[in-house]
From Swiss-Prot:
GO cellular component, one term: nucleus
Record function comment: Forms a chaperone-bound H2A.Z-H2B complex that acts as a source for SWR1 complex-dependent H2A to H2A.Z histone replacement in chromatin.
Keyword Chaperone tagged: yes
Keyword line: Chaperone, Nucleus
Originating organism: Botryotinia fuckeliana (strain B05.10)
Self-association state and partner proteins as the record states: Forms a heterotrimer with H2A.Z-H2B, stabilizing the association of the histone dimer. Also, with a lower affinity, forms a heterotrimer with H2A-H2B.
Family: Belongs to the CHZ1 family.
Record's subcellular location: Nucleus
Biased composition (Acidic residues): 31-59, 88-111
Protein name: Histone H2A.Z-specific chaperone chz1
Pfam family for this entry, one: CHZ
Segments of this protein annotated with the region Disordered: 1-111
Length: 111
């Protein structure tokens, strides 16, 4: 009978419903009360909220960049008149290497 109770105890320890083992206290190195680990800073961590607020307050908005009264909503814009005020584009320089579909390409022609 002792063989049966031994195997029953082994089966009872196995299986579902087993509670988790007690957590063990694991300390790294000597003297777990070192404050050096608390002083180490993670380079990828975001800065504390206090520093972020200081940086944001240092960057003031330049008032000269704010445009007053330049709303265009609902206004009729004459694009033809606006185009006359702009200087002409120098498109001739950009068209030098353009070839239309009708032209043959000597470099790629197989025959």
């Amino acid at each position: 009978m002792s063989a049966q109770t031994g195997s029953a105890a082994a089966i009872g320890d196995k299986g579902k419903g087993k509670s988790a083992a007690e957590p063990q206290d694991v300390t790294m190195g000597e003297g777990g009360d070192d404050s050096s680990s608390e002083e180490e800073v993670d380079d990828d961590a975001p800065p504390p909220a206090e520093e972020v607020e200081e940086e944001a307050s240092d960057n003031e908005i330049d008032k000269s960049n704010i445009i007053q009264g330049r709303r265009t909503r609902g206004k009729q814009i004459d694009f033809a008149a606006a185009a006359k005020d702009l200087p002409a584009d120098d498109d001739e320089d950009e068209d030098d290497d353009f070839q239309s579909e009708g032209e043959e390409d000597d470099e790629m022609g197989g025959n």
